[in-house]
Design a protein with these regions (language model features):
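Carbohydrate-active catalytic/glycan-binding domains of CAZyme proteins
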Residues: 1-341, 345-384
Length: 384
C-alpha cells in the first residue's frame, strides 16, 4: 500500500511498503530510485520482533518516511470510521540500518475514534496516507482525512511532534472552496485521496489524485501549485486543469476532455459511484493510446476547465458522440451566459461540432455543458 522512498545515510534509496493483508513493513534498497530494488529487511524492534506483530501494535499501512542524519522517521496508519481498534498515525524512529527501531511508535495524529488526543484534529481526523515534508525548519505532516476527498496538513517543530492541525490543502471535489460556488457544493465526484507537497524549482506543488470510471479504484494523478503564508501555513487551493503548467493553459489548439477539473451534474452528491453523473472513462485497456473521454454527459451536467489565456478565440470545436437529443453549449462559468451552441446527432462514432463562440480575451475557465434529452460523450475540443 502507498509506498514511500527515502535516501539513507549511505546514499542509497530505501523503499518502504506494506503488502496486502500483512501488518508489517518491508524495505527494499537500490542505488538508484528507478530500481531494480532488492529486499533489505523488515522494520523491527531491537529484540527482532517485527513492527506490527508486537502486542499493542496497530497494523501497518501507507508508510511515509524522511531521513535526517543517521535517523529515519517512519509514519504509518489507517483509521476507518467506527473502528475503535485503530487510534491514529504513529511515527517510529529507525537506526541508520534503516530497519531497526530506536524510538518506539508514538501517536502523532488522531483518527476519528480518538478525539481526546488532539481536539484541533476533530473536524478533519486522520484516515490514511501519511506523508512528511520539511520546509524552513517546520515539519509538515500531510494526510488524508476521514472525509477522504481532502488532503490536510499539520505542523510541528519536530518530526516526532507534537503536531498542530493546519488545514485542508486540496479537495478532489473542491469542497471548501467558495470563491465561485457554495463551499459545500462538489464539482466532481469525491473519493479517497493520496499525495503530498514537493518543491520543484522555486515553487511548491501538491500532488493528489481524483477518480475515473465512476469507481474508487481507478485514479488520475493531478497537481496544483500551492503557496505559503508568512507563518508557514498553507491556504486551500482550488482544483484546476493547469497541473505543472505554471500558469493558465494556452487558449489555442486541441485539448483532451479528460483534463477537466470539473465533471459535474446539478445537485450531485459528494462521493463517487452515483448513477446518472458524468465521469471520465476509456475504451480499451490501460496503456492504450486511445484518448480517455467524459462519459454520460446529460441534462444539467457538464465539464469545466480552469484556466485558459484566451486571445481571439471565435470558435470551439467539440469532438463528441452519443445518443443525445439536445445541444452542446459553451460558457465561461458554470451558470454563465451560453456563448454558442450546436445541436447533437445520434451516432456511436466521434463527430465534430463547430460551435461559433466569441470568448472574451483574458484568463477565464471554459465550460462545455449539455441541455436536452439522452446522453453524450466528449473526447476533446479545439479552441480556434
Amino acid at each position: 500500500y502507498a509506498p514511500d522512498i527515502t535516501i539513507g545515510p549511505d546514499g542509497k534509496y530505501y523503499l518502504y511498503y506494506v503488502l496486502d493483508h500483512l501488518p508489517i513493513v518491508s524495505v527494499a534498497v537500490c542505488d538508484t530510485p528507478a530500481g531494480e530494488f532488492e529486499f533489505h529487511g523488515y522494520v523491527h524492534y531491537a529484540d527482532g520482533t517485527k513492527l506490527g506483530e508486537k502486542e499493542g501494535d496497530e497494523p501497518s499501512f501507507d508508510p511515509g518516511v524522511i531521513t535526517e542524519g543517521d535517523k529515519t522517521y517512519l509514519y504509518l496508519g489507517f483509521c476507518g470510521p467506527g473502528d475503535t481498534s485503530r487510534t491514529g498515525s504513529f511515527v517510529s524512529v529507525l537506526d541508520k540500518d534503516m530497519v531497526t527501531i530506536i524510538e518506539n511508535p508514538k501517536l502523532v495524529a488522531p483518527g476519528c475514534m480518538n478525539k481526546e488526543f488532539a481536539p484541533d484534529f476533530n473536524e478533519h481526523p486522520f484516515f490514511e496516507a501519511p506523508s512528511i515534508r520539511k520546509r524552513n525548519g517546520k515539519y509538515y505532516f500531510v494526510y488524508s482525512s476521514a472525509a477522504m476527498h481532502e488532503l490536510c496538513y499539520a505542523m510541528s517543530d519536530s518530526p516526532v511532534g507534537p503536531f498542530t492541525y493546519g488545514g485542508v490543502i486540496v479537495s478532489n471535489c473542491d469542497l471548501g472552496i467558495d470563491t465561485y460556488k457554495d463551499g459545500k457544493t462538489p464539482v466532481a465526484p469525491g473519493a479517497n485521496n493520496h499525495g503530498s507537497i514537493i518543491e520543484i524549482g522555486d515553487e511548491w506543488y501538491i500532488f493528489y489524485h481524483r477518480h475515473t470510471n465512476n469507481t474508487w479504484y481507478c485514479r488520475q494523478g493531478c497537481a496544483e501549485k500551492i503557496s505559503f503564508n508568512e507563518d508557514g501555513t498553507i491556504n486551500q487551493v482550488e482544483i484546476t486543469s493547469c497541473g505543472l503548467n505554471g500558469g493558465p493553459l494556452v487558449g489555442k489548439g486541441k485539448y483532451p476532455a479528460y483534463i477537466a477539473c470539473h465533471v459535474y451534474k446539478k445537485d450531485m452528491g459528494v462521493y463517487i459511484g452515483q448513477s446518472e453523473v458524468p465521469f471520465i472513462k476509456q475504451d480499451g485497456a490501460d496503456g492504450d493510446k486511445r484518448l480517455s473521454f467524459v462519459h454520460n454527459v446529460t441534462e444539467n451536467s457538464g465539464i469545466g476547465f480552469k484556466y485558459f489565456e484566451f486571445n481571439g478565440v471565435k470558435k470551439v470545436r467539440v469532438f463528441a458522440r452519443g445518443y443525445g437529443m439536445g445541444f452542446i453549449e459553451i460558457r465561461t462559468s458554470m451558470d454563465g451566459e451560453v456563448l454558442g451552441k450546436a445541436q447533437v446527432h445520434h451516432t456511436n462514432h466521434w463527430q465534430v461540432y463547430d460551435i461559433d463562440a466569441a470568448i472574451p480575451d483574458g484568463v477565464s475557465p471554459l465550460y462545455i455543458t449539455y441541455s436536452g434529452g439522452g446522453s453524450i460523450e466528449i473526447q476533446e475540443f479545439e479552441l480556434v
